[in-house]
């Protein structure tokens, strides 16, 4: 992997991770276009690990932006902020469904859904769903009072967590499902976005840690059977590329998150629905014209 490739992948990760357009789908397409992860099973294993580990940069960006909530939860743990403790329990409730489903179906998802056609399908279905929801809201405006983050209950958080499980299908978008879930249970736009970002920190941290600790199962070079996935990735791509990708993800995620909150409050999700349908159509056309294989 060249440095410019790790920089580009980091920018893609940071920009798309918290937008409702699927970072996983974009990274799969970008890696295919650059020929990364296509040489052997071990190369693909390392590429998948790289894509997950640079999420650490995006995690740091959200921790910095939402340090107030993080501090609140830390104070809650030592009994000094009941609201912070409640928020922490709500995040755990939202995280548990994905943790259980992820542990059970992780390998099946990697084996069957990490292809271009599954990504294209989820991009387009999700885009149409967003546009249909926007149309419905215009015809049936919701005038009821909305909940702020402090009024979220663990039962409602669990519903958001169940919807997050759908995003394990690459291309669906974890942010889309959790923001939509937050709006569904009655949160304000700002509260839904904030909960989505904070839940993302917990979910992505767990996914990154699991990848770093997992044993490689690729049927490639012999070292893949003796070292963890993280070491396999570093052997293939080097520490410098991981650092470049992580820093690029952190900076771009910081800017994307700051922009998204205000944008959604002013304009809603429609543009993301249009984008998802458009990029799904473009990638489908590239596959059908054999520009690259599915």
Name the predicted role of every residue range.
Residues 1-294:
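Multi-pass membrane proteins that catalyze or facilitate reactions on polyprenyl-/lipid-phosphate substrates
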């Amino acid at each position: 992997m060249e440095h410019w490739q790790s920089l580009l992948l980091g920018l893609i990760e940071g920009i798309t991770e918290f937008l409702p357009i699927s970072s996983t789908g974009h990274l799969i397409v970008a890696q295919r276009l650059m020929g990364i992860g296509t040489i052997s099973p071990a190369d693909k294993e390392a590429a998948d690990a790289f894509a997950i580990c640079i999420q650490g940069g995006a995690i740091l960006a959200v921790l910095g932006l939402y340090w107030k909530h993080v501090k609140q939860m830390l104070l809650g743990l030592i009994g000094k902020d009941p609201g912070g403790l409640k928020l922490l329990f709500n995040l755990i409730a939202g995280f548990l469904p994905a943790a259980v489903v992820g542990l059970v179906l992780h390998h099946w998802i990697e084996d069957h859904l990490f292809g271009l056609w599954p990504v294209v399908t989820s991009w387009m279905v999700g885009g149409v769903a967003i546009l249909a929801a926007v149309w419905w809201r215009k015809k049936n405006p919701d005038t009821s009072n909305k909940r702020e983050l402090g009024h979220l209950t663990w039962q409602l958080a669990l519903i958001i967590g169940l919807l997050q499980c759908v995003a394990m299908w690459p291309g669906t978008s974890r942010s889309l499902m959790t923001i939509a879930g937050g709006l569904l249970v009655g949160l304000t736009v700002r509260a839904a976005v904030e909960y989505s970002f904070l839940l993302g920190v917990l979910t992505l941290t767990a996914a990154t840690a699991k990848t770093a600790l997992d044993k490689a199962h690729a049927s490639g070079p012999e070292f893949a059977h003796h070292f963890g996935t993280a070491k396999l990735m570093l052997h293939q791509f080097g520490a410098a590329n991981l650092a470049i990708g992580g820093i690029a993800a952190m900076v771009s995620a910081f800017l994307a998150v700051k922009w998204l909150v205000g944008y959604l409050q002013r304009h809603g999700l429609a543009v993301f629905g249009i984008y998802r349908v458009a990029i799904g159509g473009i990638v489908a056309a590239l596959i059908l014209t054999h520009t690259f294989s599915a």
